[in-house]
């Protein structure tokens, strides 16, 4: 079992941490910009249809795959739930995870404010539960979808025994994100990412059901990270050094 390291505030001044935070901000910004932008475009062009859902799923799949690959300096988390899953697996310190969460929320907010400006004040679509879907059902949806996302991250990127999958992790993770949006988009919205939900809610001022997209993804991501690392991976404990980069690759 890997030990969770608290870290130290001195990490924030280390060059590797600063670089990681810059890259994490850029990749999360671009991910949210493309993801929310695709949702705004499809809503304007085709409305709330199956074609629109498919287009949004494909856009998210591609941008997740590319941004994880491009974000090798930070690990390309893009998502507080991914960061939590890696934290509970012992791959990032508590302090650096906290910095990542702030980074991700700021990046998402900046992307959505810019989208609102560039589209002449169009509303940023928020994640809400579909009619007839209860809070409990929505949370379970998000737990399962985010669990599958983190399970894929561990199986294809983190696991040292990934073998022939080495190098394909970002692409396969993107596929899972797209598939999950197709599966759950019509019911819970398939957020899987508190930061992805936070930016649009902040810009639109619509916080309806917003807490669901923190509770569900954080539980699902945390469970997947803890279970995969401590049950499915067999290796001795190696403490996280202060200057260690929390990479996914």
UniProtKB/Swiss-Prot annotation:
- Check the record and name the SUPFAM superfamilies matching this protein: Aquaporin-like
Places the protein is found: Vacuole membrane
Its record classes its membrane topology as: Multi-pass membrane protein
GO cellular component term, pick one? central vacuole
Which residues get modified to N-acetylmethionine? 1
Question: InterPro entries from the xrefs?
Answer: Aquaporin-like, Aquaporin_transptr, MIP, MIP_CS
Q: Which PROSITE patterns does the record cross-reference, listed alphabetically?
A: MIP
The superkingdom listed in its UniProt entry is: Eukaryota
Q: Where is the signal peptide?
A: none
Cytoplasmic topological segments: 1-20, 71-105, 159-166, 234-249
Kindly state the positions of the motif NPA 2 in this protein: 193-195
Q: Which GO terms describe its molecular function?
A: channel activity
Q: What does this protein do?
A: Aquaporins facilitate the transport of water and small neutral solutes across cell membranes. Transports urea in yeast cells in a pH-independent manner.
Protein name, UniProt field: Aquaporin TIP4-1
Q: Which organism is it from?
A: Arabidopsis thaliana
